[in-house]
Design a protein with these regions (language model features):
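A short glycine-rich, Lys/Arg-flanked "PGG" loop and its adjoining helix->strand segment in the class I
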Residues: 164-181
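Conserved class I S-adenosyl-L-methionine
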Residues: 78-89, 97
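A basic, amphipathic helix-loop patch mediating RNA/tRNA/ribosome contacts
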Residues: 1-49, 82
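Conserved S-adenosyl-L-methionine
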Residues: 96-104
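S-adenosyl-L-methionine
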Residues: 103-165
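Flexible, glycine-/basic-rich loop-and-beta segments that form/coincide
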Residues: 239, 245-266
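Residues at the N-terminus of the alpha-helix immediately C-terminal to the conserved SAM/SAH-binding loop
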Residues: 89-94, 111
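Short, glycine-/aromatic-enriched active-site segment of Class I SAM-dependent methyltransferases
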Residues: 186-202
Length: 266
């Protein structure tokens, strides 16, 4: 019996935009073969076998729903603004910004070849690959993007780095009035000793991780204006949080500590 890789079969049968998109659908558990969920892209599929996709998400990444939740919760204007998507990856956050009327989005990531083509082809998107945001300055970002002006909205979903290391460079490329909507990932804030099997299980460590980010931002002139739990868990099931920083709308982190405790269960 001839067989085809599942990711290739999903794309060939018109159930995904591309093989890359198919692989993501498979990894996220949306694809079934003869009614059984399969999460391995290389799984062999015969021509006579049924392949279906459940609950197809129109967003290029599930992370898009994290930003949607934040923008629904916080009174942050997207329409008409120049935005930076820090750690754009496949472009889920960028996609949300485009849908909400951003005039231009600089989609920056340290990696290469990750941005979904459906996002990258939008004329409002400026893709910046191989860009380490930890060392961003107005000059380096302008040189890499060709956009010679400060952004007035920053969103971020960064992995394998503490937000404390990138807050200052992110602030440097933004206007004083800019809004910052950032995803706090405790698994990258607490250090290796606080992570077991990829998960931050200690609620006090989660609370410390969130509070430390709030204080780090405040020390750089960014008070906290909003804070919510992410509606979707992160990798390995980690609980994550979304914060809104704004110089005019925000307040001292001490006013948010009860909220931190409530959210993290500490």
């Amino acid at each position: 019996m001839d067989s085809t890789r599942l990711d290739a079969a999903v794309a060939a049968r018109g159930l995904a935009r591309s093989r890359t998109h198919a692989a993501r659908l498979i990894a996220n558990g949306y694809v079934r073969v003869d009614g059984t969920p399969v999460v391995k892209a290389s799984f062999p599929v015969g021509d006579e076998q049924s392949v279906t996709v459940d609950g197809v998400d129109r967003y290029v990444s599930r992370g898009a729903h994290k930003l949607i939740a934040a923008l629904d919760a916080f009174p942050v204007t997207v329409e008409g603004r120049l935005a930076l998507d820090a750690g754009a990856s496949t472009g889920g956050f960028t996609q949300v910004l485009l849908e909400r009327g951003a005039t231009r989005v600089i989609a920056a990531d340290v990696g290469h070849g990750q941005l979904d083509p459906i996002i990258g082809k939008d004329p409002r998107v400026v893709e910046v690959e191989g860009f380490n945001l930890r060392f961003a300055t107005p000059e380096t970002l302008a040189g890499a993007s060709g956009v010679d002006q400060l952004v007035d909205l920053v969103v971020a979903d960064l992995s394998f780095i503490s937000l404390g290391l990138v807050l200052e460079p992110l602030i440097s490329v933004a206007t004083p009035e800019a809004d910052f909507v950032l995803l706090i990932k405790p698994q990258f804030e607490v250090g290796r000793t606080g992570v077991r099997e990829g998960i931050v299980r200690d609620k006090d460590l989660r609370a410390d991780a969130v509070a430390n980010v709030l204080w780090a931002a405040y020390d750089l002139g960014l008070p906290t204006a909003g804070l919510i739990p992410s509606p979707i868990a992160g990798g390995a099931g980690n609980l994550e949080y979304l914060v809104w920083f704004n110089r005019d709308a925000g307040s001292n982190p001490t006013e948010w500590l009860d909220r931190v405790t409530e959210m993290t269960g500490a």
